[in-house]
A protein has these predicted regions:
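Phosphate-bearing ligand-interacting subdomains
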Residues: 39-99
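Short helix-capping segments at alpha-helix termini
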Residues: 26, 84-88, 192
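Short, low-complexity, intrinsically disordered N-terminal peptides in bacterial proteins
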Residues: 1-5, 181, 213-217
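Short, basic/aromatic-enriched C-terminal tail that caps enzymatic domains
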Residues: 53, 200-217
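Structural signal for interior beta-strand "rungs" in well-ordered beta-sheet cores
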Residues: 92-208
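Short alpha-helical
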Residues: 13-16, 74-75, 105
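Short amphipathic alpha-helical segments
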Residues: 19-22, 78-82, 124, 195-196, ...
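Hydrophobic, well-ordered beta-alpha structural blocks that scaffold small-molecule cofactor pockets
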Residues: 1-49, 56-58
C-alpha cells in the first residue's frame, strides 16, 4: 500500500464515498478539489480546495497521489489521463472488504468499492469505477473509464469497452463483448456482443432502437 497522501478531485456524493473507502484502506485524504463546493471549507472533515484541476496540477504537492472521483466516465478518464501526462501519480483505492485476485490487474486510478470481487486474470483499466458489490469474473476486461454499477456482474471472459456503463445488477453472459461508450440498463442481461455507443435494456438486452421498432402500433 502506498504511503502517499491523496487529493480527491470531486467532492459530490461519489467523491465522499471514495474518501470513505480511502480512509478504511488506511489512506490519508488531505483535500477535496472541487470549484462547485467553493463555499464549503470542509466536507467529512476534509479541507475543500476551490481550484480548477488545471490550477491544482500546476502546483502539485510532493508525496501526493490524485484520485478522480467524478461520475461522468469521459470526464473522469480525461482528467486522469491529463494527470498521467503531467507525471502526477494516480491512487488505486480498494475497500478492505473487496476481494482482488493476485493474478488480476488494476490500472491507475481504479476504485473497488465495498463487496467487489475481481477474479483470476481479470483486467480493469485506468480510472474505471467498480461500484459496490460488482463482480468481475475470470478473464473479464473492463476498459479505461468504464463504470460497473452496484451489483453488476461480468461473467467469465467478457469485455466492457472504454467509458461504458453497466447498470445496477446488470449481467454480461460468458464471452460477451460490448464496445466503447455503451450504456447497459439496470438489471439487463446481455446475451450477445454490442458495438460502440449502443444503448441496451431488458432481458435479454436489446438496443433501444430495436425495441422501438418492434413496439406494437
Amino acid at each position: 500500500m502506498s504511503n502517499c497522501n491523496i487529493i480527491i478531485v470531486g467532492a459530490g456524493g461519489h467523491g465522499r464515498v471514495c474518501a470513505d473507502v480511502a480512509r478504511r484502506a488506511g489512506r490519508n485524504v488531505t483535500a477535496f478539489c472541487d470549484p462547485a463546493f467553493s463555499q464549503a471549507t470542509e466536507i467529512l472533515g476534509i479541507p475543500v480546495l476551490a481550484n480548477s484541476e488545471r490550477e491544482l496540477f500546476d502546483d502539485w504537492p510532493d508525496a501526493t497521489e490524485l484520485f478522480v472521483a467524478i461520475g461522468d466516465n469521459a470526464r473522469r478518464l480525461a482528467i486522469a489521463s491529463d494527470a498521467c501526462r503531467r507525471g502526477i501519480p494516480l491512487a488505486v483505492l480498494i475497500d478492505p472488504s473487496a476481494v482482488i485476485s493476485p493474478s488480476a490487474t488494476l490500472g491507475d486510478g481504479v476504485i473497488a468499492m465495498p463487496g467487489v470481487v475481481v477474479n483470476a486474470e481479470a483486467f480493469v483499466g485506468r480510472a474505471a469505477l467498480i461500484n459496490t458489490s460488482a463482480i468481475v469474473e475470470h478473464g473479464a476486461r473492463v476498459g479505461q473509464g468504464a463504470h460497473l454499477g452496484p451489483g453488476a456482474c461480468l461473467t467469465g471472459d467478457t469485455a466492457v469497452g472504454a467509458r461504458s456503463f453497466v447498470g445496477a445488477r446488470a449481467t454480461l453472459l460468458p464471452g460477451v463483448h460490448i464496445g466503447d461508450d455503451v450504456s447497459v440498463g439496470a438489471r439487463a442481461v446481455v446475451t450477445r456482443d454490442a458495438g460502440d455507443r449502443s444503448r441496451l435494456v431488458g432481458v435479454p438486452a436489446r438496443p433501444v432502437r430495436e425495441l422501438r421498432l418492434i413496439e406494437p402500433t
